[in-house]
Amino acid sequence: MPKGNFYTQVTYRFRSDDGSETAASWLAAENTDTTIALDTNFRIRIAVASSGLDTWTNLVWNLYYSLNGSSYTAVTASSPVKFSASSNFADGADTTNQLTKESYLNFITNNNGMKETTGGATNSGNAGAGDGFETEWCL
């Protein structure tokens, strides 16, 4: 990664695991927390923006959680916050632009952003300053 290139979480939004990448229902407005029943699959969608030019080939994004203000830990299939299989999308499918886009100019379509049973969304292609993508995780 080039020195001085930063990636920023622009926005997030919770949704139900009740439909496809484009049709699942939203649980709350952007950047708004929600309450989810225990042992209920849900999805969180996160927009990420790049501050500079970078080759995104094999760049891996991971999801982390923190319980009660403790340190951040990577989400796995067996952690307290864990990945969950979804019958509504394929792991590694591309996401479309569904969140507010004002913080980045170009949406990267080859993004492999839909994630369920494995960690790490792996991008391919190039990103320039102001480019971004969305990743959605089923938990």
Question: How would you describe each model-predicted region?
Answer:
Residues 1-139:
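Polar, enzyme-active/binding microenvironments
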